Amino acid sequence: MNTIKEGQNFKAVDFGSIEKLIDYELPMGPDVLKGKVFGGQAVCATGSEFSFQTLVPGQDGGFLHSHKTHEELYFILRGEGEYQVDGEVFPIREGSVIRVCPDGKRCIRNNGTENLTMLCIQYKANTFGADDNPMTDGNILQEPLNW
């Protein structure tokens, strides 16, 4: 992963191509989880965490898990598989988005014939209220673009 550019209000990082995400390794105790990388700290995120993960055909997440306070959004970027939440199993594929509350017992598996790649975003649950509409929070500025 390489820093592209950073400034007072931003940091941009390159994780490489989707095909190369499989090369990342995440230490988990005595084991190493291949194909997963966290990125929130790399971009200095202050309100969320995110990870990319690639599962090869036949691979699953390895274990059910839940969270204490984090809700998760899973974006399936490539491939197909199945997702399990609280014992419910359903098909997923490129373009699927899954939201799971902190208490949801979850896992993913690739039952397809090609790699499955996803983006997972974690953030504290129940932090957005009725007044947190993205259309009213944004400010359209009357400044020129500097392309």
Where are these regions (language model features)?
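A short, N-terminal "cap"/entry segment at the start of jelly-roll beta-barrel domains
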Residues: 1-47, 133-147
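Conserved short histidine dyad/triad with adjacent acidic residue
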Residues: 32-38, 51-67
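Short, charged/polar surface micro-motifs in flexible loops or helix N-caps
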Residues: 44-48, 56-60, 80, 124-127
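Short strand-coil-strand connectors
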Residues: 46, 84-88
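Short, conserved beta-strand element in jelly-roll/cupin
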Residues: 52-56, 66-84, 121-123
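Short beta-strand His + acidic residue motifs that chelate non-heme Fe in jelly-roll/DSBH
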Residues: 63, 83-84, 100, 106-112
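Short acidic-glycine-tyrosine-enriched beta hairpin
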Residues: 87-103
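Double-stranded beta-helix
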Residues: 107-147
